[in-house]
Amino acid sequence: MWLTILGVALAAPAGLALYFVATARRIARPTRGEPIVRDATKAALLVIDMQEDFTRSQGANAYDGQERDRAIGRINALVAAARKAGEPVAFIRQEHQGRAVQWIASLLLGGAGNPGRPGARLDRDIDADGCPVFVKHVADAFSDPALDAWLREQTVGRLTLTGLDLAHCVRGTALGARNRGYRVTVDLAGSLAAREKPALHAVDEMETAGVVLRGPEDGAPRAAMV
């Protein structure tokens, strides 16, 4: 009896660690879908996960306040430019789905990203008036079929992505978009990254997939921005 209990106790941490790893991989995996049509040429802007749970976090993964304000200023400028050009703009929100994932978020992130929290809303300084908001439960925003359908209805074939986190949901959405044939640009000046090494790895991965990384001034790829 005691040996059985001891065995379970010893195995539990290893099993829990494996579950964490498997869950993280599932959440990070880019989705695949039907290729877009050839005549889809319109441009659109997607702003990812700029929610107060993340932008104004005070925990270990908190973003620098000045960097956050810089990114928000850039995003608002991109939104204004897209509106002036008559291009669609959409915002993406993260909501963790499932008790296990929400428990992990509570354990590791203080509950950030769990539904029903005041911090689940878009940042107070973001200009999202009149823009549709799509909710995702994993890194790739294309996991919500409504987003892809909305883009296809408007014959969008070119996407500019920005937001957070560059190493996770921006990366996942960029790769999910490329899997469907969208031409993708990531605006680094409007993007935030909590950790440098994962962000640099994501930059390499996105460039390999054909994503254009635009810096703040000359439009050239700028890994140094992260």
List each language-model region with its residue ranges.
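Glycine-centered short loops/turns at secondary-structure junctions
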Residues: 86-87, 155, 181
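Structural recognition of alpha->loop->beta junctions
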Residues: 111-133, 194-226
